[in-house]
Every structure is written in structure tokens, then in C-alpha cells.
Amino acid sequence: RQAVVERVAVRDLGLKGAMVDPNALGRPLGDPAFDPFWRAAADLGAPVILHPYLLEAVERFGVHYLHNLVGYPFETTLGAASLVLGGTLDRVPALTVVLVHGGGFFPYHVGRFDRGHQTRPEARRDGAQPPSTYLRRFYYDTLLQRSEALAYLAGIVGHDRVLLGSDHPFWLGDPEPLQRRTVTIAPR
């Protein structure tokens, strides 16, 4: 049903893509039950942005603004990891996914994901490549607040996979995204 709604939104209303919460009511995004949605997005050429909104175990994130500082990048990481480890990116190769907050923790802990793939059967599907081989299947926004972190991201995924992001109007948004982008990833 959601795939039909997406087709109407893109074809009839002119929308260019979709934004989904990585927390799909407690189900992993890589669950094959969501494949009709992912296939519809790919068929329409509509990118899907993973942007967290709902947190699991919210009581653990309730102090010190942790829901935003840790919780949202954590949810982005869960969404990306589920799409990779659950096989969605293999089943729907034309799918375009944008990860906000610089991809959460996924690009920075991809070595840990690779090690899990190598050593733990539950983190590996038959025929699946190591998670690091999927890094360039995603696009990433620049919302990292540190030039060094953005330089690392661009170095590991490629400059062509990094998109300007501001997170406007939220409080943790980057007030000068163009300046940070120019300093960090402009061609030399």
C-alpha cells in the first residue's frame, strides 16, 4: 500500500523523493516486508532520506540531550546497517539512500561491521560482501560540525557521495554549512 502512495506522490504530485524514519515501528528497515517500498522508490528514481525521529528506549536518552546527540545518529546507523546486513541493497540495487548526520556512526565504525561480517555468522548472509563495500551505495550529508570528521567521511566514501546538509531549523544544525564544505571537501 505504501508503495502505491509513493507512486502517487512522485508521479502525480511531483515530489522528488521520500524521507523515512530508520525506526520503522520497531522493525528493521532491511526486513524484506519493506521491499515493495524500496523497489517503488528505485523504480521511480526517487531517493530516500533516512532521518531519525522516533527513538527506541527513549528513557535512556532522556538526559543531557542524549536523544539528539547520540540517539539520532544511532538510529541512522541502525537503518544503514539493516539495509546492508539485511540484504536490501542487494535485492534493490538501483535504490538511492541518503544518510543524515554524516551517516551516523556507520562510516566511522565500518571496520567493526566488517569484522562482525568476518567472524559472526548472524552478521553475514550467503554471498554478501563485507559492509565496507556498501559505503558508496549511500549518500551522506555534511552535518558533522567538525571539518576533520567531514574530511574523514569524504576520504572514505568519496567526495561525490557527500551532499550539503544543514539540519535547518533544528538546534544542532550547521549555521555555516557552505563554509565548512568549502574548507573541507572542495577540489584542490
Question: What is the predicted role of each segment?
Answer:
Residues 1-86:
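Active-site gating/metal-coordination segments in enzymes
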Residues 65-85, 92, 96, 100-188:
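H/E-rich (His + Asp/Glu) clusters that bind or coordinate divalent metals
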